[in-house]
Amino acid sequence: SIGEELLDDWINEQRKDGFTINHSSIETTGFPFLVRIEILAPNALNSATGLSWWSEKLHLDLQPWDLKRYRLEALGAQQMRYRSPAEKGDFTANTTGIEGVAVISDSGTLTALSLVLKNVRITEADHGSLLKTNRIFADIVRPDYPPIAHTESALEISVAAEQTEVAALHAPILGDTITSIKAKVEFLGPFDGDTIF
């Protein structure tokens, strides 16, 4: 099917960047108005960077007439892990679900990504719990083509979190739980070298 072909092409592209991606069964439903690809037990590993991820189930939705917008839903338990190659940290993030929408530009690069992560718990092997939060919202936006002038936006990242407990912050003025945290960062001008997008 068109969905499985796109997925296989994407997996092969990730190999060039050092990622090994595996999964169990794949089922495609919904054609012709909406294509849903259901992937069981997907996982990804990049030994060189120390990154790994696994999920119970993944849904990828796309419309056959718009191959530049994808909806992603990771169902059930998820785990992302970063183990520093220099053995300076072993971080694990667990969540009960991820929802996202990705938009691909005319040039073939990721131009927008919106994510919602549910019930996030971040721990470090030597220090235990670092952060707990009910939800994290993240939006990443970049232009279709890299900026030329130093005043043009190259990347914009917005992050918000709800009901957050941070182990390192025990300030009485803040209380045990921070109701809402929001941050926005904008990078201006061209980037030197490769970027993750």
Residue ranges of model-derived segments:
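Glycine-rich, small/hydroxylated-residue low-complexity segments
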Residues: 1-197
